[in-house]
Amino acid sequence: MQKLCSTLVILSISLLTIGQKISVLDKLTSKKLIGEGKELFYAGRVSEAMLTFKRAKLKNPLSGEACYQLGVAQFYLRSYYNAYENINNAEILLSKKQDGEYYYDVGRIFHSVNKIDSAKLFYTLAAKELGPRISKDYDLDILLEQCDFVKNQESQNIQNICKPFSRAVNSKYDEYGAILLYDKKRLLFTARQPETTGNNINDNDQKFFEDIYRADWNEQLQDWKINIPAMEEYNTEGFDALNFISRDGTYGLLTINTSATVEKSTSSSEIYEFETDEEDSSWYIDPIRSESINTSYFEGAATISDTSFDEDETATQTMVFVSDRRSDKSLTDLYVAQRIDDKWSEAKPILELNTLGRETTPFITADGRFLFFSSDALPGMGGYDVYYSEWVNESWSKPTNLGASINTVNDDTHFQYFPEIKTGTISSIHDFDGYFSYDIFSFDLSNSDFPFVNQ
């Protein structure tokens, strides 16, 4: 397939160049547009940059620089197949030796479409050009390890077992954080769709704000049916994400951020909890009141164990969440706090698991024995991978990658496991009619030998 794609690209370039002349004016205009596109890109306006690079390529289809810059912008917008096509064009059209950043970008694009041998080649070239110190800043050692990890998984013929939910819930927009309730009859998840409350768009990524969605299984249709009114009173005009619900559906944890709206009930992302009304099952939502949990930094993606009782009948729950309060030393970290007889202990970083990169979307089993999370700085397939750790001798064990049966070469997050039905859910970057976005998946672990399944 890779040879076929390369052949088609070469053929398309050859056909393009036959008898074609690019005027000096068009070349100059293309160069000017590339400069404008770079300014937009570095200002974080990637969508506008991508359109500008497209115009540059139209003016001069033989500009390798236009193809390269367009491919990079498309990569950041998760248009991976288009990025792959344009970066192949750039490789053919650019005759001069390139710098390390170019090789790094090409490697990332090949990695995103699972062209691992090519990705490793360009990562190696990038490391050679950039040198040891700068290569570390680009995480090239991690990226090369990821290539080796993928090849190892391929050599074992490990098949991915994740199956996407239907298009009744998955779309070209982002869906993530799937939670199953009531014997798989109810599905709750978070999405960034045009119907979001307030119709607000995030300036940073030009995507809609988050809302919580509910879908119920329809026996007649044999499919999910979204129930929009069910969540209307809980979604704000800000960011609303559901992170955890107890198995009986009576308690849950959310991440809410209204700092960018007129509501401004939060100063940043904060962790909220809810309990359901016994009569009508409505949610009573309140922020967790602890200065060491909710701070002025980002806090969210919380998960919590069931209540355990010691010999003195002290009630204890363990909550794990994500914060960027140590952003001067790392990006996002996992933190743990205990609720002991309804009082919160001081939140502390989980030093055994945190890296200099990003740890996110934890999930703790009901008994508190296993902790799952995603990281982009541990040995894995690429992007975020899902790992698990076991609580042994009063500390968390070395993280174990769930492998290619669950993870992919792109981002995999929001893992949850439901032992009563031996089913898990995950969110992954997925191809939806040529457009890559977060979709929600489920997988059956009935025949799995993972230790958390057979405990």
For the regions a language model picked out, list residue spans one by one.
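Conserved structural position within tetratricopeptide repeats
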Residues: R55-L58, N89-I92, K128
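Alpha-helical segment of the N-proximal tetratricopeptide repeat
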Residues: D26-K59
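Start-of-helix register in tetratricopeptide repeats
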Residues: K31, E65, D99-E101
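Short, conserved micro-motifs composed of acidic
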Residues: Q69, Y76, D105, S112, ...
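Short coil turns that delineate tetratricopeptide repeat
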Residues: K27, P61, S95-K97, G131
